[in-house]
Amino acid sequence: MKQYLDLLDRVLTEGIEKGDRTGTGTISVFGHQMRFNLDEGFPCLTTKKLHLKSIIYELLWFLKGDTNVKYLQDHGVRIWNEWADETGDLGHIYGYQWRSWPTYDGGFIDQISEAVDAIKHNPDSRRIIVSAWNVGDLDHMNLPPCHAFFQFYVANGRLSLQLYQRSADIFLGVPFNIASYALLLQMMAQVTGLQAGDFIHTLGDAHIYLNHLEQVKLQLSREPRPLPQMKINPDVKNIFDFQFKDFELVNYDPHPHIAGKVAV
């Protein structure tokens, strides 16, 4: 994935050292975009091994509208534990906003269902957007959304998705985000009868934490390998019916995992 390695190299070369909320310190650039054509393979990083199980279960968790870590923990996924309260809840984060965005009159909007409907029945719309950045609800989130909103685009029988990510932890978070939204694009394309097109990833504050610099340099020393393919159960026609068993990543041959501490 040259696009990702180019981002790492750019931040190492051009990045400005800044403080941050966690006290760890970063080097960062502001504004970067990567494009992944899913015809060329599934964009799962090969210069270090990713924990695909966590990526899939997290996405299914979002789509369920769930905001409690119990579902994740029941499936051996612990990536949200640091931000959960004593009951396991995370407040009104991604799943809540995607599926139950509150309206002024006491109702709720299921943004995912509305996006599916728009792709099917109004594909030329420029309003097929799902947002997790609810300004009026930020104080009710244990962690405000880093990947803030995404938009769908339909052309020539292909569905593309562009994500805006306000805050991008390049070493740990961004590889997960790329794979997660590429998978969401494939799922949405399948249930709307389209081919998966491009995933475009637009970053705001793109940063490397100072305690990840050596890991990043190690990753840049590794030669990328061919991308794998993601196979999805073709019988699933409803976006909310997918289960973990419906996904198979084939021909994934990554370099070994590189550990890094999460900045909380």
Curated annotation (Swiss-Prot):
It catalyses: dUMP + (6R)-5,10-methylene-5,6,7,8-tetrahydrofolate = 7,8-dihydrofolate + dTMP. Its EC number is 2.1.1.45. InterPro entries: Thymidate_synth/dCMP_Mease, Thymidate_synth/dCMP_Mease_dom, Thymidate_synth/dCMP_Mease_sf, Thymidylate_synthase, Thymidylate_synthase_AS. GO terms for cellular component: cytosol. Keywords: Cytoplasm, Methyltransferase, Nucleotide biosynthesis, Transferase. Its main location: cytoplasm. GO terms for molecular function: thymidylate synthase activity. The keyword Transport does not apply. Gene3D superfamilies: Thymidylate synthase/dCMP hydroxymethylase domain. DUMP binds at residues 21, 126-127, 166-169, 177, 207-209. The keyword DNA repair does not apply. Pathway: Pyrimidine metabolism; dTTP biosynthesis. (6R)-5,10-methylene-5,6,7,8-tetrahydrofolate binds at residues 51, 169, 263. It is found in: Cytoplasm. GO terms for biological process: dTMP biosynthetic process; dTTP biosynthetic process; methylation. Belongs to the thymidylate synthase family. Bacterial-type ThyA subfamily. Catalyzes the reductive methylation of 2'-deoxyuridine-5'-monophosphate (dUMP) to 2'-deoxythymidine-5'-monophosphate (dTMP) while utilizing 5,10-methylenetetrahydrofolate (mTHF) as the methyl donor and reductant in the reaction, yielding dihydrofolate (DHF) as a by-product. This enzymatic reaction provides an intracellular de novo source of dTMP, an essential precursor for DNA biosynthesis. Homodimer. This is Thymidylate synthase.
